[in-house]
Every structure is written in structure tokens, then in C-alpha cells.
């Protein structure tokens, strides 16, 4: 572990929960952002099928 000296400054009983908490908060922020800014993500979580895209052939 190349950052082993961090535990001389911060006790592992404090640092590990802080790190895990920060990861959890970051994940919640990312998922909340996806849910509020996209229409497909909520549908994906609800198990709805994806909308079909129909390709139109170019006119000649």
C-alpha cells in the first residue's frame, strides 16, 4: 500500500467509514443526476423495454 502513512494521521476507525461514506454519497449523486436529467434511465430501472428506432432509407 503506497499510502500507508495516512493512517498515522487519521485512525482507520474514522478514515474507512469516511471513505466508504464519500463513495456512497458520490454514487447517489450520480444516480440522482441520471434520474432527473434523462428519460430512459427511470424506464430502464422500471424494466420497461427500450424505444425502438426505425431507420429510414435515404430517398433516391
From Swiss-Prot:
Protein name (database record): Light-harvesting protein B-800/850 alpha chain
Q: Which gene encodes it?
A: pucA
GO terms, molecular function: bacteriochlorophyll binding; electron transporter, transferring electrons within the cyclic electron transport pathway of photosynthesis activity; metal ion binding
Q: How does it sit in the membrane?
A: Single-pass type II membrane protein
List residues binding a bacteriochlorophyll: 31
Q: Which UniProt keywords apply?
A: Antenna complex, Bacteriochlorophyll, Cell inner membrane, Cell membrane, Chlorophyll, Chromophore, Light-harvesting polypeptide, Magnesium, Membrane, Metal-binding, Transmembrane, Transmembrane helix
Query: Which Pfam families does the entry link to?
Result: LHC (PF00556)
Provide Periplasmic-side residue ranges: 36-60
Please verify whether the record's keywords include Cell inner membrane.
yes
Q: What does this protein do?
A: Antenna complexes are light-harvesting systems, which transfer the excitation energy to the reaction centers.
Ranges in the Cytoplasmic compartment?
1-14
Q: Which residues cross the membrane?
A: 15-35
Amino acid at each position: 500500500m503506497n499510502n500507508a502513512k495516512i493512517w498515522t494521521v487519521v485512525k482507520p476507525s474514522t478514515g474507512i467509514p469516511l471513505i466508504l461514506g464519500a463513495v456512497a454519497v458520490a454514487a447517489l449523486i450520480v444516480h440522482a443526476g441520471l434520474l432527473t436529467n434523462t428519460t430512459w434511465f427511470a424506464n430502464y430501472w422500471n424494466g420497461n423495454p427500450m424505444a425502438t428506432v426505425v431507420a429510414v432509407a435515404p430517398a433516391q
